[in-house]
């Protein structure tokens, strides 16, 4: 829209095949995602459900759009479409590029999708806002995990670019770098906020241009904006295995050594309230119903022998 008048912008986009839309100022993004769709109904629900939950971002001459799966869309099924990242010319609305958040054959990261799960698994997308780095022609993209949130036995592998931070060249859509904050995510630990750009004054290194990703886990993952190298060392720590049939989790997860976590990591009996002995007893009784543990405590089967509820 023209920001002064609110009228559709002349010369931007074009006619879309839906009655009532103006002949200019509109871009049909569904056409650029590459899936069959009906102009009025969208992508068939048996294929998937796609939407946009955050505003587009303008980086120099490029508009970048992070698409996402509809929140809560049929989490009982494994099929969905991926929320690939789209880019358009900011003046004309002309399509520039698409970045596949689930790599296709021959693309970097395709080998992290075993069982040919890349063909029908979806949900990997960017529902959180993107971050612009106009000086370096970079857009930083935070992503969420694949279908389904708490089980991934049908999609063995690390599942790039799920639950990652991706730096894309805004002119070409090429991946500059990426970092996967959770491998084979079955905890719904999607990156929930726009990456933060900051300049860090580090003793012995001077001013370092950085980008930081705040996470649901209470960690902040901090990287060199240009290279993606962690500012401080990451530790690949061993995590528990899953007892759910068919599930094969990653044996390790990357943990930042700095900064320290800003939130508690998992839960144990020591974390329960003890204002009075009665409250303590009641809290323990409630906790006994749940399978609680460390940060990467695996989800459990609903029909587990202990009769507990996954936390």
Q: What is each residue range found by the language model?
A:
Residues 1-311:
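Beta-sheet-rich non-transmembrane sensory/scaffold domains
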């Amino acid at each position: 829209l023209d920001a002064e008048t609110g009228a559709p912008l002349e010369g931007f986009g074009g006619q879309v095949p839906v009655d009532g839309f103006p002949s200019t100022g509109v871009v049909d993004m569904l056409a650029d995602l590459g899936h069959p769709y009906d102009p009025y109904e969208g992508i068939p629900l048996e294929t998937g459900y796609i939407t946009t939950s955050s505003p587009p971002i303008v980086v120099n001459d490029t508009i970048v759009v992070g698409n996402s799966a509809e929140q809560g869309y049929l989490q009982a099924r494994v099929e969905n479409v991926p929320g690939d990242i789209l880019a358009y010319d900011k003046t004309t609305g002309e399509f520039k590029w698409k970045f596949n958040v689930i790599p296709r054959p021959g693309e970097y990261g395709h080998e992290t999708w075993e069982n040919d799960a890349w063909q029908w698994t979806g949900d990997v997308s960017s529902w959180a806002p993107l971050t612009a780095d106009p000086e370096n022609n970079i857009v930083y993209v935070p992503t969420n995990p694949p279908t389904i949130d708490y089980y991934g036995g049908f999609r063995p592998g690390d599942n790039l670019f799920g639950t990652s931070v991706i730096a894309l060249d805004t002119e070409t859509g090429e991946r500059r770098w990426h970092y996967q904050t959770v491998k084979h995510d079955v905890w719904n630990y999607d990156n929930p906020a726009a990456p933060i750009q900051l300049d860090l004054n580090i003793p012995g290194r001077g001013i370092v241009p950085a980008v930081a990703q705040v996470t649901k886990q209470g960690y902040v993952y901090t990287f060199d904006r240009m290279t993606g190298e962690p500012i401080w060392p990451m530790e690949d720590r061993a995590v528990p295995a899953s007892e759910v049939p068919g599930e094969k989790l990653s044996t390790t997860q990357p943990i930042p050594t700095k900064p320290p976590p800003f939130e508690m990591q998992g839960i144990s009996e020591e974390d329960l309230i003890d204002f009075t002995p009665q409250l303590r007893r009641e809290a323990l009784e409630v906790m006994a119903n749940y399978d609680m543990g460390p940060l990467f405590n695996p989800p459990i089967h609903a029909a587990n022998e202990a009769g507990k509820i996954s936390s």
